[in-house]
Amino acid sequence: MSFLLIVRRTHLYLGLFLLPWVIMFGVSSIPLNHQGGEGGAQWTPIKDGPFTAEPPASADPAALRALGAQMMKAADIDGGFWVYRVNAQRVDAGHPNFLRPVRATYYVDQKRLLVERRSVTLEGFLTGMHTRGGYNLGGFWDTVWAVSVDLVSVALLAWIASGLFMWWELPGTGLRRWGWLALAAGAVSFALIIAKL
């Protein structure tokens, strides 16, 4: 089997592997680019009660993460979560579920924890898939998602490289000229937009 045939098959099967991911990123880009609010998404309280955990005195991320874990436990929420200190009197934490994310707000001065769940919306579902990432959420499936995104990123780069190699191996110069034109048009338009923004 020739090297070119290996590259072609790699390109083909990487394309098939990437298909659901590329479709997801393509479709989820539409609501990100055409934002019109949350399209009727509502946050519904599911728990509202006392909470007396002491917030960390310092800006130590580990201490804040520990408080977030207590908030999630009090909210009866399993899985990965994020946590953010809004100010001295408020700490937010949340579980970024694709369909029905949950957020918990700790009002420190009131010793109160408000837990809310967002209603299901197509816009929220799609943008959640597009923007979710990172290994810092801590849940098993959150880590699986992060690893998958890394694998897809590497596969996309390999797919691009194999496509460039196949283009370069085209016989004659006529077809290669069209490739140079496409590369130049893409690079110039991208650079121009980046420079102007």
Summary of predicted features, one role per range:
Residues 1-42, 143-197:
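Internal alpha-helical transmembrane segments
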